[in-house]
Structures are given as structure tokens and as C-alpha cells.
Curated annotation (Swiss-Prot):
Protein localization: Nucleus, Nucleolus
Family: Belongs to the NSA1 family.
Subunit structure: Component of the pre-66S ribosomal particle.
GO biological process, one term: ribosomal large subunit biogenesis
Top-level taxon in the UniProt lineage: Eukaryota
Protein name: Ribosome biogenesis protein NSA1
Length: 445
């Protein structure tokens, strides 16, 4: 497996290459084959988001408001020391990274000042990127959204290896997420759902020329609780489902469905055909422990995590709290299991599902973990030495180890030898049978 890890402490990018079963917390277990630090820029310039492009390039968004176009080149792994006598080092390629272009000034802390200046209890809010997503593959157009409510449309010129800003928009801040709707084929518009602290979910539409942005829908808060207190608003993540297809479908109304989790441990299910309030709004945890992320599991999921089903009952989902838990729930909000229970010791600051089968997790305890979402078993655990902010899986290929290759060759030779011996035994038995038949005929005569 080959992954890229954003490490907050040094503002670096780490390439980690390993096989299934790797565990750095156990000395006798399999160890990672390669861990190397790249593009280190310090704590104030850590990497928020990573987006892999189609031609061996990456978009890397940093906390200082700079987006970098990074070129990756695969080169054979070089070793600085000789292998132990009678052994060989494994042979594989590693990446060399080079920044080829940048765009700066894409964040604005001043837009967040009104949200905390009037309160003595609030900490200062720092702007950061909440999404970097491919918008139009044919045109190489990407959308970037920030916590301060800035939405940028940029173009990747693959021939010149250049980044160009096409347009910028402003929406209500703060944003904890901005999720693109990608569940239909060709569309003449782009739909985005966003929200955050005291910022109810809103759906916006960007036209195909990227010249206009308008709000098309806004959620409404649920009714007050049993003490007639306002239910706090803080959606932290959203995933779309396919449009509603039931008998009550009204064709003249917009038709979108999505699910959310909130900072206050609420699960929300929304259908715009139903109205502005959620279809369901449930407490997930008894003490309303803060939740921070959302990933959905379904039979089919798009590359950016939206569920290719119109039924809420077809999905399960994974979320994280601010303590140490990675939690898996069914569609009704019933807790199914905790990933890494007893193993994760710090806040899980990042999770993502990759290739529809791997759960990648990292956080304050500085360990990269990979789980199989079908068996829920841990595949790998690797210490990277810094708080993890983002993880992306490049490939899940296993590296063949020389010792393993030799064992396989020995097993093949043994298997061939057994087959030859079996054939020789069969031949001997055949001749013996023929001799027996001849002898029997002669005795009769």
C-alpha cells in the first residue's frame, strides 16, 4: 500500500509504503517499507487538503492560503546500506515531489472576526480549506471552499502545469464542510451543500460557466426541545443520496436528499421534497459528545463519498468524536461497533473511506491506521511521528518481499516434484497392471 499523510507539526507531506499486517507498535511485527518526509514548511503552513490529479500531479491546499500544484515522479528506491548477508532488500518505486506552480491569498481570517470578537469566551477562529474537489473533469476545473465562506473556482492547465483562478464567490460563514453533489450524469449546473456553526445547511447552485452562484434551498431548525430551548445548530458534515423516487414525488419541487451529523451528536435525514425541516433528527450518543466527521457506507458510493441509493435504509455510516472513538452506526443511528477500540489513544482528527473497502484513520496519537470496512479488522498501524491532518491512498498494491518470493519459488519446486513423483508412480502401476494381465492370459492357455 502507498499513502500520503499530511503532518501538522512540521507542515510536511509523508509518503508511507507498507504491506498488510504492518504494525510499528510491535517490534516483531512487519515494519513499513518506506517512510519519507517531503515539502516541509513548518507548523503555520500545514496541509489542509490533498487532491490527486490524473497525470501524476496533486493539488495541495495549505493553512496559509496557498494552493500548490505538485508534480510526483516515481523513481526506484535507493538504499544507503548493504542488506544483511544472505538477504535482499525489496525492490519498488518511491515518489519525488516538486512544487511547479502556486496560487496564494485564497483564505481570509478577517471574514471570521465578527463571529468571535463580541464574545470573551470564544477562541480566535482561523481560516482553513474545508474542501478541494474536482468540479469538471473534462475542463480540469476544481472548487475550493474555506471556513470563512470563500468559494474559489480554479483551472488546472495540464499542458503548461499551471493553476488559474477563474472566479471567487462569498457565502455565509463559518463553513465546516462544502459537499459537491455528483449523483447524476451531465448537468448544466453544479450543486453544493454547505453549513457550519450556527449556519444551517444550505444548497447553492453554480452555473456551468462559473459566473453565477445562487442559493436554492435552506434547512430549518427542528422545534425546541422539551424544555422549550432552542436545539443548537452546528452541522459538521454532509453526504448526498440520490433523489427521492417515491409516490409522493412532486416534479415542480427541487429534489435532493442528504444526511448530516452535528457537533452536538445529532443525525439528520433531509429530503427537500418533504420541506425545510429534517425527516428525522436523532441523538446518536447519550451525553451528546461532540462529533466531527461523516463517511457513508453503501453498495455503491461516488469518489467523493455520496451514496448511490435513494433509500436511507441502504446506508450505514462512520463518524468520530473528539476523544478517541471511531464509531459505526446503522441508518437508524444504532451503534454497531467502535473501530480500534482500546487502541486509539488520541482524538481521531481524520477519517476517509478509500476504494470502497478501506477506512483510513489518523489523529493526535500520531498513528496511521487502515481498517477493512467489510471485516472491521485492522490491516495496518504505523507511527508517523506527528499529528495527522489528512490521508490519501495512492494504491493498495502489496510489495513482494524477497524472502517471501524465495519461499513461493521453493513451494512451486516442491509442488512440481510431487507431481512428477505422482506421475512416475502412476506409470509404474500401469506397467505392473499390464504385466499382471499378460501373466493371467498365459496361465489360462
Amino acid at each position: 500500500m502507498r499513502v500520503l499523510v499530511s503532518c501538522t507539526d512540521g507542515g510536511s507531506l509523508k509518503e508511507v509504503i507498507f504491506n498488510s499486517g504492518t504494525d510499528t507498535s510491535v517490534q516483531t511485527a512487519l515494519q513499513p517499507l518506506h517512510v519519507e518526509t517531503h515539502l516541509e514548511q513548518g507548523l503555520n503552513n500545514y496541509i489542509n487538503k490533498i487532491s490527486q490529479l490524473s497525470n501524476g500531479e496533486f493539488l495541495i491546499a495549505r493553512s496559509n492560503g496557498v494552493v500548490e500544484l505538485v508534480k510526483a515522479t516515481l523513481l526506484p528506491k535507493e538504499y544507503t546500506e548493504e542488506p544483511p548477508e544472505g538477504k535482499q532488500f525489496p525492490s519498488f518505486d518511491v515518489n519525488k515531489f516538486e512544487v511547479v506552480d502556486t496560487l496564494a491569498g485564497l483564505l481570509d481570517n478577517k471574514r471570521l472576526e465578527p463571529l468571535y470578537q463580541k464574545s470573551k469566551k470564544r477562541t480566535k477562529l482561523i481560516d482553513e480549506f474545508v474542501t478541494v474537489t474536482l468540479l469538471n473533469e473534462k475542463l480540469n476545473i476544481y472548487i475550493l471552499a474555506s471556513k470563512s465562506g470563500l468559494i474559489h473556482i480554479i483551472k488546472h492547465n495540464s499542458k503548461k502545469s499551471k493553476l488559474e483562478k477563474i472566479n471567487s464567490f462569498e457565502v455565509k460563514a463559518p463553513l465546516d464542510f462544502a459537499q459537491l453533489y455528483d449523483l447524476e450524469g451531465k448537468m448544466d449546473k453544479y450543486i453544493l451543500g454547505y453549513g457550519g456553526e450556527e449556519n444551517l445547511v444550505k444548497l447553492i447552485e453554480i452555473n456551468k460557466n462559473f459566473t453565477d452562484l445562487k442559493q436554492i434551498w435552506e434547512a430549518k431548525n427542528v422545534k425546541n426541545d422539551r424544555l422549550d430551548m432552542k436545539v443548537p445548530i452546528w452541522p459538521v458534515s454532509l453526504k448526498f443520496l440520490e433523489p427521492y423516487k417515491g409516490e409522493k414525488l412532486e416534479k415542480d419541487k427541487i429534489n435532493y436528499q442528504f444526511t448530516t451529523v452535528s457537533r452536538y451528536s445529532h443525525l439528520g435525514k433531509y429530503r427537500t421534497q418533504h420541506g425545510r425541516k429534517p425527516l428525522e433528527y436523532k441523538d446518536l450518543l447519550p451525553n451528546r459528545e461532540p462529533l466531527t466527521q461523516l463517511e457513508v457506507i453503501s453498495e455503491k458510493v461516488t469518489p467523493i463519498g455520496n451514496a448511490q441509493t435513494s433509500e436511507f435504509s441502504d446506508i450505514t455510516f462512520i463518524t468520530t468524536d473528539t476523544k478517541k472513538d471511531v464509531l459505526k452506526f446503522n441508518h437508524d443511528g444504532r451503534l454497531l461497533l467502535k473501530y480500534g477500540k482500546g487502541d486509539i489513544l488520541g482524538s481521531p482528527t481524520f477519517i476517509t473511506i478509500s476504494k470502497g473497502k478501506y477506512l483510513l484513520q489518523g489523529g493526535l496519537d500520531r498513528y496511521l491506521r487502515v481498517f477493512d470496512i467489510n471485516t472491521n479488522e485492522r490491516i495496518a498501524k504505523i507511527y508517523v511521528g506527528a499529528k495527522i491532518n489528512y490521508i490519501t491512498l495512492l494504491d493498495d498494491d502489496e510489495i513482494e518481499l524477497p524472502e517471501v518470493a524465495k519461499e513461493k519459488e521453493k513451494m512451486k519446486e516442491k509442488s512440481k516434484k510431487r507431481e512428477l513423483e505422482f506421475e512416475e508412480d502412476n506409470d509404474d502401476q500401469l506397467w505392473n497392471d499390464l504385466d499382471s494381465i499378460k501373466h493371467h492370459k498365459k496361465s489360462k492357455i
